[in-house]
Curated annotation (Swiss-Prot):
Reactions mediated catalytically: a quinone + NADH + 5 H(+)(in) = a quinol + NAD(+) + 4 H(+)(out)
Membrane topology: Multi-pass membrane protein
Quaternary structure, from the entry: NDH-1 is composed of 14 different subunits. Subunits NuoA, H, J, K, L, M, N constitute the membrane sector of the complex.
Residues passing through the membrane, by range: 7-27, 31-51, 63-83
GO molecular function terms noted in the UniProt entry: NADH:ubiquinone reductase (non-electrogenic) activity; quinone binding
UniProt keywords, alphabetically: Cell inner membrane, Cell membrane, Membrane, NAD, Quinone, Translocase, Transmembrane, Transmembrane helix, Transport, Ubiquinone
Localization (cell): Cell inner membrane
Task performed by this protein: NDH-1 shuttles electrons from NADH, via FMN and iron-sulfur (Fe-S) centers, to quinones in the respiratory chain. The immediate electron acceptor for the enzyme in this species is believed to be ubiquinone. Couples the redox reaction to proton translocation (for every two electrons transferred, four hydrogen ions are translocated across the cytoplasmic membrane), and thus conserves the redox energy in a proton gradient.
UniProt protein name: NADH-quinone oxidoreductase subunit K 1
Gene: nuoK1
Organism from which the protein derives: Solibacter usitatus (strain Ellin6076)
InterPro entries (alphabetical): NADH_UbQ_OxRdtase_chain4L/K, NUOK/Mnh_C1-like
GO CC term (a single one): NADH dehydrogenase complex
GO biological process: ATP synthesis coupled electron transport
Known EC number: 7.1.1.-
Length: 103
């Protein structure tokens, strides 16, 4: 019978995913890439919540992850609508070119 995967592996994966999300958020100039980086950070935090919830044999982490996913889905819908509107008005997705709300 196989042994279970250690908790530290999940937390390490979560830290790596979060670091990649932060790097993408800080160093990329495309709005879509920045948006995906934010979602990656949210999913890394969700992985940590589920890992700690599993370790402590409680359901709270799973429930909190569910609520984070619901909020992230709503944020994705609104965020993508805003991104589409910005692209329609400016014809670019570069953050440096979209620096104000004025036309």
């Amino acid at each position: 019978m196989m042994n279970a995967v250690p908790i530290s592996w999940f937390l390490t994966l979560s830290a790596i995913l979060f670091a990649l999300g932060v790097a993408g958020f800080l160093f990329r100039r495309n709005i879509i890439t920045v948006f995906m980086s934010i979602e990656l950070m949210l999913n890394a935090v969700n992985l940590s919540f589920v890992t700690f919830s599993y370790q402590h044999k409680e359901v709270a982490g799973h429930l909190f992850t569910f609520f984070v996913m619901v909020v992230a889905a709503a944020e994705a819908a609104v965020g993508l609508a805003i991104i589409l509107t910005v692209f329609k008005n400016r014809s670019t997705l570069n953050i440096d070119d979209v620096n104000s709300m004025k036309n």
